[in-house]
């Protein structure tokens, strides 16, 4: 893997840059150490409590080498796993800040709300449940509880909810077709 990565051009290498992180709406101080982002919490997160963690980040989708990327060998435009900043798990043994270097990881289970804005010619398959079929079309509108209302412009925003999952994975391609049977 390292040989393939070292041969990539700058526009083919993936990266993520966290712009800011909020816990329950409050901005937190962060420091990056290679693939680890340390967060200095303004208040402790108590055991069995719930918090809302929001990240604003920029990323470049790499040419697919392993789990995630663009233009894979099967011809799929985007295959996206491990594509967002992941939280380290804290358990009975302490923190698990395992760096992401092409190996397995230890991660948090959680509830995801994900919005993906992409060219409207693409169809997305993603973890969880599509929340806005009435805006998407591509065959999903027949499952909508609201009347079909096509979005104006060249993009669509697909809104997913995925409860109690380990990762949010998605794939998108203009050649994908949504088929269903009843």
Say what each PLM segment does:
Residues 44, 61-62, 74-81, 135-140, ...:
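Short, surface-exposed linear patches
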Residues 36-42, 96-101, 144:
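Short structured motifs
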Residues 1-9, 58-112, 179:
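Glycine/proline-rich low-complexity spacer/linker segments in large multi-domain proteins
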Residues 2-5, 36, 75-81, 121, ...:
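Generic secondary-structure boundary/loop-capping signal
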Residues 86-94, 102-182:
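Hydrophobic helix-coil surface modules that form long, contiguous segments used
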């Amino acid at each position: 893997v390292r040989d393939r990565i070292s041969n990539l051009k700058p526009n083919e290498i993936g990266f993520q840059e966290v712009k800011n992180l909020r816990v329950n709406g409050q901005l937190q101080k962060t420091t990056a150490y290679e693939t680890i982002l340390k967060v200095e919490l303004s208040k402790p997160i108590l055991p069995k409590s719930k918090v809302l963690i929001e990240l604003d980040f920029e990323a470049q989708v790499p040419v697919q080498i392993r789990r995630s990327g663009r233009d894979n060998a099967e011809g799929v435009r985007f295959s996206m796993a491990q594509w967002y900043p992941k939280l380290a798990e804290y358990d009975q043994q302490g923190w698990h800040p395992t760096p992401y270097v092409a190996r397995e990881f230890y991660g948090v289970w959680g509830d995801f709300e994900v919005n993906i804005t992409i060219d409207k010619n693409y169809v997305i398959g993603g973890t969880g449940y599509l929340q806005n079929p009435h805006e998407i079309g591509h065959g999903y509108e027949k499952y909508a509880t609201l009347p079909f209302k096509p979005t104006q412009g060249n993009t669509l925003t697909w809104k997913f909810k995925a409860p109690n999952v380990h990762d949010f994975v998605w794939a998108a391609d203009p050649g994908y077709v949504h088929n269903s049977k009843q």
